[in-house]
Amino acid sequence: MIPDRGPAGMDSTDGSSGEAAGGARVPDFFIVGNAKCGTTAIYEMLRRHPQVFMSVPKEPWFFARENPRPQNSTETSLEFTGSKHESFEDYVSLFAAARADQRVGEASSSYLWSRTAAQRIAAARPDARIVAIFREPASFLRSLHLQMLSTHTETEKSFRKAVELDGARREGRQLPRSADWPRALIYSDRVEYVEQIQRYRAVFPADQLLVLIYEDFRADNEGTMRQLMRFLEVDDRLPVEVVRANRTLGVRSVRLDAFRRSLRAGRHPGARALRELGKGLTTRKAREALYYPLMRRTVYRTPPPADAEFMLELRRRFKPEVVGLSEYLGRDLVRLWGYDSIE
């Protein structure tokens, strides 16, 4: 039990039952990341399972708030300074609609690289099941860079230069004003795979932790999902509807993307009028059929090919991490990820 209100703003909860004060539920399981490793597709496929309830939004980030009350602090922090769910009551309310016979989960991809999330989750729900997903480091970081460019978290368009900024950003320099979690932009921190999984193994028994490999998931979506269902102890015999989600794209026009985001967030003066006009003229399905192809033609584009020389540099740099993860998990990721030919 959590005896008092901790640094993340948590109230007491009976971890053995997953029931918080007032009868609200703490999740039975957490998909803790990594980002760009299929977590969105897995989330969407689990949502379709009748015995599973997933939070909306997908990523509450509650247990990853290392600087939980930044608005009350004058400190300069590399930690999260956004406005996600501020109280434990707000957080557990996300799961209030779950039926008693459903497994309850969420999928905050920040939990895997957060330095405190594992301990906080264990304090709130010591019997929780944890799902972690790892991807070949160089391709993961490139995909992450493209994703953060598209969300305007990152402003350095060159992948090489962005990675080379790690040292300066660790000191709080050369950070985009739009970054509400600056440490997310320190790329080398994101591939400390062994340390990430060790944080969970330190507070959860091995049988409560499932480690998946992204390349396995890509090769066999259905098989991986059935493995996950068995781990969560829900019916794995039901049909699996394969979902493609959160495809990595490059940004064709930063200005058009910023305009699109301001409309969707309601910040543009004409946003409400445009939304109401669209609703009056077309169905939601028709709007989506028009919207997404239009965005792909005007705002986004297929990413350019990766810089092969820099990708090789990254693989050489991260080979010791891959070797360490292989040894820790007892699986030959060196061969699977093509590091056996890298000197």
Model-identified regions with their sequence ranges:
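PAPS-dependent sulfotransferase catalytic core
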Residues: 1-108, 123-133, 137-177
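Alpha-helical packing segments of well-folded alpha/beta enzyme cores
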Residues: 87, 91-94, 117, 193-197, ...
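Charged phosphate-binding loop/patch that engages nucleotide di/tri-phosphates or the phosphate backbone
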Residues: 184, 191, 322, 328-342
